[in-house]
Regions:
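Catalytic cores of carbohydrate-active enzymes across secretory and cytosolic contexts
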Residues: 1-356
Length: 356
């Protein structure tokens, strides 16, 4: 949203984060702004330079040369916009330089400002998080020219998200190098893994998933266990309309037949944005559909309180991941990367990082 608390959080993160680095004796050569919410770190550096005697023009050039803006959003209009009075109350008290104060106030249009405009103005290097995202992201600058983003596809930390035994298998077979990156012939080496080894790793993953599920509750307030011999599909990501968590339930007859014929279960989990009333309603409709169908009621499980632990357990212990965003609306996504790193099948539209 665009309320005072959101701006307060961004101010605390940016100005407070930059001050914390100074107190730790850290003088960063380059600051990476991961999304617009961190922009006030660059503004804090600009204020510091001007307060120490550098003129505004030279300070802006310096900050631009030493700041990288990583954008994860496709449309500028989707980001928060704040009123001048909010900046006067929450931002200006953190700025000492009159030159920086005046420059900041000049960025407003009709008394409103999106902080991403500051990110565009105060950074020279800008990147999107997939090739497709960098190509289609629509962010105009002050002159209404489209900003050019370089493409750097998001990745994941294998140590965090991959079953340890699977990761060790990758190392033992030369599938990844000492930096955790795929080797040139990783595909051929993956193909050479035996079926027995793969089944063993999947068995370990299912055991870990069921351990986590013991402490979780489904839509009926009960814990569940997925049989070792059952195929498990999952949808585990933020519940946003463009991600279409409801799509598999638009044809319940087909879904029912798939689950029966393949001895399969389906886990649905994720969080709805607090203000997304439409998505809440769609989720409620899906849960009612499941409740009214004996097969779906037995085999489709909505797990409450989605978090990192559950996300990791499903990446490790499920068999196939459902990733079906509307093409052109996903910047990158990383859940699918965690899935394929754990040797799962990926059922996906070709969007974001998947398209790469």
């Amino acid at each position: 949203g665009s309320g005072d608390h959101r701006l307060y959080q961004e101010v605390a993160l940016g100005f407070g984060g930059y001050k914390a680095l100074k107190l730790l004796g850290i003088k960063p050569a380059v600051i990476q702004l991961n999304e617009t919410a961190t922009i006030f770190a660059a503004l804090a550096r600009l204020d510091e330079l001007c307060s120490n005697g550098m003129n505004l023009y030279e300070a802006i050039v310096y900050v631009r040369k030493h700041t990288l803006y990583t954008n994860h959003t496709l449309l500028q209009a989707a980001e928060p916009e704040f009123h001048r009075s909010q900046f006067e109350k929450l931002v200006l008290p953190n700025i000492k330089s009159n030159a920086v104060r005046c420059w900041l106030m000049e960025q407003f249009r009709n008394d409103r400002l999106r902080p991403n405009l500051l990110a565009i103005e105060l950074t020279e290097a800008k990147n999107g998080v997939s090739k497709l995202h960098a190509r289609v992201a629509n962010f105009p600058d002050r002159n209404n020219d489209k900003v050019k983003f370089q493409a750097i596809t998001n990745g994941i930390d294998l140590e965090t998200w991959v079953l340890p035994e699977t990761l060790q298998t990758y190392r033992d077979h030369g599938i990844i190098d000492k930096f955790g990156l795929p080797t040139n012939d990783f595909s051929e080496k993956l193909d050479s893994l035996s079926s027995a080894d793969l089944r063993y790793l999947k068995k370990l993953g299912r055991k870990e998933l069921n351990r986590v599920l013991l402490s979780r509750q489904d839509q009926y307030g009960k814990s569940i266990q997925i049989p070792e011999n059952a195929i498990l599909f999952d949808f585990k990501r933020r519940f946003a309309n463009y991600k279409r968590p409801y799509m598999p339930f638009e044809n319940p007859d087909s879904l029912r037949q798939i689950l029966i014929s393949h001895n399969a279960h389906y886990i649905l989990t994720g969080k709805v944005h607090q203000g997304d009333v439409t998505m809440y309603q769609k989720l409620l409709e899906v849960l009612k559909l499941i409740d009214n169908d004996p097969v779906l009621k037995e085999r489709v499980h909505y797990i409450q309180d989605y978090d990192e632990e559950l996300g990791r357990a499903l990446a490790i212990g499920s068999d196939a991941s459902i990733n079906i965003p509307i093409v052109g609306l996903e910047a990158c996504g990383t859940s699918w990367e965690k899935d394929i790193a754990n040797l799962k099948l990926l059922i996906s539209t070709s969007d974001g990082g998947v398209a790469d």
